[in-house]
Amino acid sequence: MTTDTTGRAGNPAAAASPDRFRYGFLKGNPQLTKNGELKHLLSIEGLPRSIVNHILDTAEQFVSVTDREVKKVPLLRGKSVFNLFFENSTRTRTTFEIAATRLSADVLNLNINASSTSKGESLLDTINNLSAMHADLFVVRHASSGAPYLIAEHCAPHVHVINAGDGRHAHPTQGLLDMYTIRHYKRDFTKLRVAIVGDILHSRVARSDIHALTTLGVPEVRAIGPRTLLPGGLEQMGVKVFHNLDEGLKGVDVIIMLRLQNERMSGALLPSAQEYFKTWGLTPERLALAAPDAIVMHPGPMNRGVEIDSQVADGPQSVILNQVTFGIAVRMAVMGIVAGNSD
């Protein structure tokens, strides 16, 4: 499903670019209220460090909820959260549903395949109808970059929008849970060297992580991957680019591995998965090039034997499953914060 500038189902080539949605019809920062509080979470880009830290601090308070016998707090009691996933997702949709339920919200998961959008209704008409049902918060995943911005501009004033991933553009809650994970294990962002490895070209997670890391003051962010899978402009963002995995991993404190997003590739950008693993897969031998206490992360889904060896994924330096656990607390924090702010 893609949208043109009117929000109707359309040709992928006609889908609006992220820049249009960030800088076209929206002025200022569309995520913030007039008082500078977070009303929507659409992207980490442009958020002040104070808001990012506020989200991480709030998430820390929610982590303990997971260990309680009754895993609920009444923060969103009486609120309705609509999960609108126009792209398939298991992990993200499930963690948002768990997070909303633990905040005592009423949760609706829209069945996109059976919805009016699959029958030709425009995206904006769908959003307007759902707003009329007195939804309080939309969690949106969409194949078109910028779709959550379009929804945030046109939904009812009382509705809040959280971007759960839009095209190649952004995945802000994944970026935030990655930052929470790093902070949990490393504490001081200003002394870290962080490597992001793999298919950065097609990764909305990589973009969100880069913006979050630079916002939080990480002095050295490295992008490591084959030339065909690295976007232009990384150096302008302050990122060091490496085309050799062994060189790029030397001395890093955090390694974020990315899967190959074959569904977003339009041509033969790489050889076989086996050849990719030989050159770009994270093995125990390559992990040894990093700092002795380096942590290994992955946003999932993980392809063992392609971008990461099972010994690394299941090893003592892997914090991949903890990312999932922390993700619930981070998404609770985001929903709780945005739902409490309005113009």
Swiss-Prot record:
One of its GO terms (biological process) is 'de novo' UMP biosynthetic process. InterPro entries: Asp/Orn_carbamoyltranf_P-bd (IPR006132), Asp/Orn_carbamoylTrfase (IPR006130), Asp/Orn_carbamoylTrfase_sf (IPR036901), Asp_carbamoyltransf (IPR002082), Asp_carbamoyltransf_Asp/Orn-bd (IPR006131). The keyword Transport does not apply. Carbamoyl phosphate binds at R91, T92, R141, H171, Q174, G300, P301. Pathway: Pyrimidine metabolism; UMP biosynthesis via de novo pathway; (S)-dihydroorotate from bicarbonate: step 2/3. It comes from the Bacteria. It catalyses: carbamoyl phosphate + L-aspartate = N-carbamoyl-L-aspartate + phosphate + H(+). GO terms for cellular component: cytosol. Its EC number is 2.1.3.2. Pfam families: OTCace, OTCace_N. Keywords: Pyrimidine biosynthesis, Transferase. L-aspartate binds at K119, R204, R259. GO terms for molecular function: amino acid binding; aspartate carbamoyltransferase activity. Belongs to the aspartate/ornithine carbamoyltransferase superfamily. ATCase family. Heterododecamer (2C3:3R2) of six catalytic PyrB chains organized as two trimers (C3), and six regulatory PyrI chains organized as three dimers (R2). Catalyzes the condensation of carbamoyl phosphate and aspartate to form carbamoyl aspartate and inorganic phosphate, the committed step in the de novo pyrimidine nucleotide biosynthesis pathway. This is Aspartate carbamoyltransferase catalytic subunit. The lineage of its organism: Bacteria, Pseudomonadati, Pseudomonadota, Betaproteobacteria, Burkholderiales. The gene is pyrB.
